């Protein structure tokens, strides 16, 4: 008694033989040519189709037995899985041949290309892997290149080609045009060559080398090196260091610090402060005129109070007075007229006095109180000449408590 597996194999072979016999009959039937009728149509030659691909029969006229394997019922009736496992030839199919029609869709190249591509690629090409060889021809369409290039590209690229990553290598050629975008960060390296154009942005750090061109904007920081050219803009901050070289031109602004080097002062010198009060002279010391008297050498113990000078302005710091020993001959301060001699003293009668009275308004007051002042006597001849006209002397001092007109009348 046969088992179930053997029965299934017998049924499968029976069906297979019947199918092959039916296909053979269809292939052996003559193909009727249109236009021929009657017995001439049967005389046409037979055209066997795929007769070489038919399975060869064994010596006994039956098909060779297959290897005994376990298959299910639906696989035994011609299932594709069982046919692939048993090695049974599948349905008849045409042999391999060339495909004349081109592929209409985009070409996808999965692996690297061993050789160069001679012709251009008309459609968009997607190249996922790097290309070991250079591309000799131009690429007409847009190219998306995700990976890096191992070799250089000799030909030009006509279409736009975006570069996703940064460029690590330096540029060998010159840069013909300026960079259109702003520079967000500082320049890390030094600039070896000169800068041809003006710099619109402020420079945060010091500049070690000299600057050949003018600077248009303000300079926030100090400049350690020499500046050969003029500075067109204003300088907001003072110059911290001394000026070593000569200054050929004028300085338009005020100088905050002292000037150490010698040089002429072009601007006006401010005059000392005026003595307050409408017409009275206040203070314990003698009254001097800075434009007339040059030195308080004969007044050792008293601090002089300077009167209004002849300068155009007024300041709070008086001009320096040279030391003793270089006193020129005193010049007359007032005109020698009969009207002025009644109110003003004659300086020729008092050559040893180093204190002088300022001209006052006669209508404002006639009494002038002066303090005691010391003076040094000259030679005996000058003392004898004016001994009859001097008032009372006590220890080299002169006490004048008279009024101005009375003193002049006594003289």
Swiss-Prot record:
Keyword Transcription: yes
GO MF term set: DNA binding; DNA-binding transcription factor activity, RNA polymerase II-specific
Biased composition (Pro residues): 95-139, 149-246, 319-335
Coiled coil (residue ranges): none
Keywords: Developmental protein, DNA-binding, Homeobox, Nucleus, Transcription, Transcription regulation
PROSITE patterns in the record: HOMEOBOX_2
BP-aspect Gene Ontology terms: maternal-to-zygotic transition of gene expression
Biased composition (Polar residues): 366-376, 388-402
CDD domains tied to this protein: homeodomain
GO cellular component labels: chromatin; nucleoplasm
Region (Disordered): 20-63, 88-246, 286-340, 363-411
DNA-binding residue intervals: 3-24
Composition bias type Low complexity, residue spans: 27-55, 295-307
Keyword field contains Transcription: yes
Subcellular localization: Nucleus
Superkingdom classification of source: Eukaryota
Principal location class: nucleus
Family statement: Belongs to the paired homeobox family.
Functional description taken from the UniProt entry: Transcription factor expressed after fertilization required for zygotic genome activation (ZGA), a critical event in early embryonic development during which the developmental control passes from maternally provided mRNAs to the expression of the zygotic genome after fertilization. Binds and activates expression of key ZGA marker genes, such as NANOGNB, ZSCAN4, DUXB, KLF5 and DPPA3. Binds to regulatory DNA sequences containing a 5'-TAATCC-3' sequence motif.
PANTHER family named among the record's database cross-references: HOMEOBOX PROTEIN (PTHR45793), TETRAPEPTIDE REPEAT HOMEOBOX 1 (PTHR45793:SF12)
Protein name (database record): Tetra-peptide repeat homeobox protein 1
Species of origin: Homo sapiens
Gene name tied to this protein: TPRX1
